[in-house]
A protein has these predicted regions:
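PEST-like low-complexity, intrinsically disordered acidic/proline/serine-rich tracts
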Residues: 1-161
């Protein structure tokens, strides 16, 4: 979930056994088990890694390992893609600061790429806006029509209030 250059909105959901983090960027949905199950075997690798979560007081801690060798250890939308995720451990912490702010902190530990782990912290403000569909449109020819339709729906909804 390391932030990228754009589309950084996210929406978390929680059940008794899982946290799901829906990211606006490419509509990635990360399903994080909270039951302290073991990580997948070392030879099973996934593009988004293998996440496990637990609560540490009021902080959700998510540790993700077992990335593929083709997953960059740092987001390629910010850089050209740095390193290989094969030795990456990503540790994330989510803590609610107040009713409208979630503090997101992540630590990148990838000894094959970096000399030492590094940690970044980002306050994330609550938004009432929807998570938009992530879609690439060839030449954006249809964008004018989609936006016109959305504005018409908003206008109609405002008239009903």
């Amino acid at each position: 979930m390391i932030p990228s250059a754009y589309n950084n909105n996210m929406q978390p959901f929680q059940t008794a056994a899982y946290v799901v983090i829906l990211n606006e960027m490419v509509h990635d949905a990360r399903i994080v088990p909270l039951d302290r199950r073991l990580h997948l075997p070392e030879d099973v690798r996934q593009w988004m890694g293998d996440a496990r979560g637990h609560w540490d007081g009021d902080t959700l801690v998510v540790e993700t390992t077992s990335f593929t060798d083709r997953t960059p250890s740092f987001n390629p939308t910010i850089t050209s893609g740095v390193g290989s995720g094969e030795t990456l451990t990503l540790t994330e912490r989510f803590r609610r600061v107040d009713a409208d702010t979630l503090f997101y902190e992540y630590t990148v530990d990838d000894p094959a790429t970096y000399t030492r782990p590094f940690t970044v912290g980002i306050p994330m403000r609550k938004s009432e806006l929807p998570i938009f569909e992530y879609a690439c449109h060839e030449g954006n020819y249809g964008m004018v029509g989609m936006l016109a339709g959305a504005r018409a729906e908003e206008k109609a909804a405002a008239g009903r209030q």
